[in-house]
């Protein structure tokens, strides 16, 4: 068996990626989230496949087909809630994975990091088009508001919006194409995830100390396979608790009402994992400025490798930047909270302050603290 896995053309790839892969001996549980994201992706594809067997992407029947899945399909309610809450678990793991990458300086592996940003954007696009499919009030109005943002693009904006809608409003054509996008995008994510792994295995994993670990590596199996299994069991436990005890806690009550173009909900907001970006969008009074800030709130992650001037790898021995990092995390939580609040004082003002802080930390404070820490080392 050992000879087969080392020589067989297909098994050799698996062997070099998951069995004999030399891995730093000191990587902590923060490194588990890559495998957890893979697990989340598999859960989403499987549950999504079974949902697609019963769902109809037609404006007249979409809402009732989701109700039919929950009422009449064997364990349909479980599949639906695993899929809905699985998306939330996916984004929790994704945020932690990116946060770990920033804290431990994994952005220095620039190809892996940039593919990761593409993965992040593709996952956000998948979640957005998926949220439209149940055709509830928030699905419809969320789709209308977010797609309408493209009209801010000079000259081609309005044409682009009508092209995406397939008409002059969000309607049957929009729902059908969003279903098609939602079905195909997870497979594109899977392909990008493999490229992400390919680039990672070219350079080898980073580690918590930020030091070179070439002299202290151990095989991935059995050490990290068992460690990942523990993480997967814990993830499944949390997901099952969410799906079985609190299935609608992260959803929006407006989505229990079928989509009605003549009745606008009091507060239109996306799913919780987009609220930080939505708060940044709303904090700028100008429409085009808001859209640019929304896009930059994700693309600014690409600035981390470019703005990095530190002589040390990661934040483990850098107390000043550590403080700034945790302010950044708290600021993100504030943005998430503000994104779900009505557009009125003082929420608008807090949103504007938090949005300025978000960009200032990445562009100004972290590079300045890097320079200060570099000078302290020289003393």
Curated annotation (Swiss-Prot):
Places the protein is found: Mitochondrion inner membrane
One CC-aspect GO term: mitochondrial inner membrane
Pfam families: Cytochrom_B_C, Cytochrome_B
Membrane topology annotation: Multi-pass membrane protein
Tagged with keyword Lipoprotein: no
One annotated GO molecular function: ubiquinol-cytochrome-c reductase activity
PROSITE patterns from the UniProt entry: CYTB_CTER, CYTB_NTER
Protein name: Cytochrome b
Organism: Akodon boliviensis (Bolivian grass mouse)
Gene (UniProt): MT-CYB
